[in-house]
């Protein structure tokens, strides 16, 4: 069992929105690993970061991602920082990984004042976002088998683009 598609990208790139719509188009389930982490731990991600630190959060995240990659056969959405873990990047090999690309300007606009995103909290959000983009873009690009620009594109157009580039067996299911 393996996911039909694994979505990666920065906060605000549309992983949850696109993921739900893509899953519907393919007639499969959707799993957001951030939600799975919160369900497993019984704690919000921001609390895990604040109490246990980013390192512990990434350890839990890697366990959840590895399990999802073997147990979930629908569309999987990873947290924005999951690719910073070498173990997660290794586990993604051989999967259909879709990088939802976004500019810093659009990402800051979409994330607004969302306090659920611990790495973007506080002042200078735009600068923090640009730093995350610079740090993570090379990791996303290396992990991705499909890249799609989400800037100024509606979710329906992004989903259609992804479906058109999925391996034939998955794309055929979406057409039926």
UniProtKB/Swiss-Prot annotation:
Alphabetized InterPro entries for the sequence: P-loop_NTPase, Shikimate/glucono_kinase, Shikimate_kinase/TSH1, Shikimate_kinase_CS
Biochemical pathway: Metabolic intermediate biosynthesis; chorismate biosynthesis; chorismate from D-erythrose 4-phosphate and phosphoenolpyruvate: step 5/7
Q: Reaction catalysed by this chain?
A: shikimate + ATP = 3-phosphoshikimate + ADP + H(+)
Provide the E.C. number(s) assigned to this enzyme.
Answer: 2.7.1.71
* Assembly and oligomerization: Monomer.
Positions annotated to bind ATP: 12-17, 117, 153
**Known role:** Catalyzes the specific phosphorylation of the 3-hydroxyl group of shikimic acid using ATP as a cosubstrate.
Q: Where's it mainly located?
A: cytoplasm
* UniProt keyword list: Amino-acid biosynthesis, Aromatic amino acid biosynthesis, ATP-binding, Cytoplasm, Kinase, Magnesium, Metal-binding, Nucleotide-binding, Transferase
Cofactor(s) the record lists: Mg(2+)
Family as reported in the entry's similarity comment: Belongs to the shikimate kinase family.
Give residues annotated as binding substrate: 34, 58, 80, 136
Q: Which is one Pfam family of this protein?
A: SKI
The GO biological-process annotations, alphabetized, read as: amino acid biosynthetic process; aromatic amino acid family biosynthetic process; chorismate biosynthetic process
PROSITE patterns according to UniProt: SHIKIMATE_KINASE
Q: Which organism is it from?
A: Mycolicibacterium paratuberculosis (strain ATCC BAA-968 / K-10) (Mycobacterium paratuberculosis)
The name on file for this protein is Shikimate kinase
Q: Name one GO molecular function term.
A: ATP binding
Residue ranges of coiled coil: none
